[in-house]
């Protein structure tokens, strides 16, 4: 069934229409919106039109585009107006904004504000009468208002779906329409791949800008990760952040990296020791001997215990996988896989439900030290959607970052000169 907001052919017009529908239907939401944008209380007797001019019949979309009219016009009969011009793929242009402002002046409005909306911040300075907001800021505001406004919630959800769809279609090339607010998958809201791709991009965009990851781990904020993820279906989607030390060297599997995966049942946050890692890095671990490796992982486990303290349901995690590829670009065939809770290797003074079985950690060390296959080892944490409520909270981004930072001792050993 077609969404009630999907009434226009141009994508930015659909978003503006969704926002205007919400403001028209919820008068209190409209008042809050005007105060948020202008900093002043909303005047009385407000009207809203789209793709038209006050006092004239509403035009169709094509005719409106030909005449270069504002996307929306909020006004009253006392010469007050708020004009809206929105973009997604095309840049904002000052001459277009000036024409809108001049049109309002010619029609007798003298208290004029022009709101310009885009996915990214404009590269040139905007006129003084223009207030700029990113679509992601509009989305964040709607999410806050959704605590009491059903229309704000509907509009925020529409923006989420639009971002997922337009990103997959290649229409949304820069910026984002939303911001990371958690991973909402649950029994009531099952995992779906396009949404997971959208959420993964939002999370990594935010994580890639974190100074603590640069400071503690040497993360490269300019790293490219996988680039475009072209898949359309699957039970997991993943991407990674590089370390500065890698110098963007290819293939990326020569260096450890920070991996985030959204799987059908959980979030997987890991430091990956890839199959093609430089021999020096692997030997730095192997040369510790099992006792040294045990002490190293005990330190990581202690760090993870602190990092996950308030993430009920999360667990420190190790994944060991042996794969092979029958031909280039083929899907991997998994020949062996071990996954285990890192707490199985260590006794604890605290009462814990996990029983000690140190042999899993020994098997990991043995596989690394006698590597003869396409072998990957990863250390970090899992956050199951069913048992870990923090996955659905914006603070999840901090747990992801802190999980990586908790694994710093492993990185330090691998990367030492």
What residue spans do the PLM features occupy?
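Charged, terminal alpha-helix-loop-beta segments
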Residues: 1-417
């Amino acid at each position: 069934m077609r969404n009630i907001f999907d009434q226009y052919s141009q994508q930015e017009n659909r978003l503006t229409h969704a926002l205007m529908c919400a403001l028209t239907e919820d008068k209190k939401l409209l008042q809050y919106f005007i105060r948020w944008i202008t900093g002043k209380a909303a005047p009385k007797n407000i009207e809203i039109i789209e793709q038209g001019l006050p006092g004239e019949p509403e035009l169709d979309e094509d005719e409106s585009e030909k005449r270069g009219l504002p996307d929306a016009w909020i006004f009253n009969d006392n010469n007050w107006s708020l004009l809206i011009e929105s973009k997604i793929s095309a840049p904002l242009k000052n001459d277009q904004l000036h024409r809108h402002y001049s049109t309002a002046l010619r029609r007798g409005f003298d208290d004029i504000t022009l709101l310009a909306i885009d996915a990214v911040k404009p590269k040139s300075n905007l006129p003084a009468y223009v207030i700029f907001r990113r679509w992601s800021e509009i989305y964040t505001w709607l999410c806050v208002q959704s605590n009491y406004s059903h229309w704000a919630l509907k509009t925020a959800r529409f923006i989420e779906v639009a971002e997922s769809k337009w990103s997959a279609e290649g229409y949304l090339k820069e910026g984002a329409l939303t911001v990371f607010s958690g991973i909402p998958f649950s029994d009531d809201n099952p995992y779906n791949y396009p949404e997971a791709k959208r959420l993964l991009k939002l999370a990594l965009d935010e994580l890639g800008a974190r100074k603590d990851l640069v400071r503690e781990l040497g993360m490269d904020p300019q790293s490219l990760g996988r680039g475009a993820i072209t898949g359309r279906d699957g039970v997991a989607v993943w991407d990674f952040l590089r370390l500065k030390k890698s110098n963007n060297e290819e293939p990326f599997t020569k260096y450890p990296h920070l991996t985030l995966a959204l799987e059908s049942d959980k979030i997987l946050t890991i430091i990956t020791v890839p199959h093609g890692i430089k021999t020096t890095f692997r030997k730095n671990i192997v040369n510790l001997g099992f006792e040294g490796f045990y002490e190293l992982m005990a330190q990581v486990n202690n760090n993870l215990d602190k990092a996950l303290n308030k993430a009920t349901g999360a667990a420190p995690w190790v994944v060991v996988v042996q794969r092979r590829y029958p031909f280039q670009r083929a899907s991997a065939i998994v020949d062996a896989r071990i996954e285990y809770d890192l707490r199985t290797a260590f006794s604890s003074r605290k009462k814990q439900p996990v029983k000690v079985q140190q042999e899993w950690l020994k098997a990991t060390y043995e596989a690394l030290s006698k590597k003869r296959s396409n072998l990957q080892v990863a250390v970090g944490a899992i956050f199951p959607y069913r048992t870990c409520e923090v996955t659905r909270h914006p603070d999840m981004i901090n747990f992801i970052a802190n999980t990586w930072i908790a694994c710093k001792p492993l990185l330090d050993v691998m990367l030492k000169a």
